[in-house]
Amino acid sequence: YMGLSIGIVGVRYNRSTNHTETTLDESLDLKELSYQEELTTTGGGVDIKVGILGRVTDRLRMGVSYHSPKWLQLDDTYYTRMTTTFRTPDSQGNFSYTGESPDGIFAYRVNTPWNVLASAAYVAGKNGLVSVDYGITDYRRMKLGGDNAIPDSYDFAYENGVIDQRFTRSQSVRVGTEWRSGNWYFRGGWGWWQDPYAGTDARHGSGY
């Protein structure tokens, strides 16, 4: 068996940050300072997934799949606002003053890492099965890029260099089994994931 899918990815992210400081000393004329930051990220992209599954014998099945990076085109829209409040008004009776930045717009591209997965399963008739999955993801393939429609846009060379230095190829192994005894079913699993940062591993134990 062989399968192919093309995915369409939509992105919308909103972040609102509010920071307020109030003076407790009433002898100070400045009463309160408030800072607000708004960020909206929108965009989309595509990805491709392809896989092959074969039955080696009546009991043994093997497969392999490839998940391409997500190729994303994103746009950030942001602005900031600051408000100061005083205890005594000015000559026009105003206690507060507010200043806003102009709206900022920044377009860029993001590529996520690809992933390859190989799997095998042994089916012991109606009694149970054992499955093994091996995956590999190269986090060094994450990339940032400027907007192709804008000449001389920022190329993210520094950021991509940091990704190459701090990330590495990550592997994972998962083993699962299920067995039947009468009306009872017993399940267990074990997994090992290599951290995308070099030098540390994360292990998840077994269960039933």
Task: Show where each model-derived region lies.
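Outer-membrane beta-barrel porins/channels
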Residues: Y1-Y208
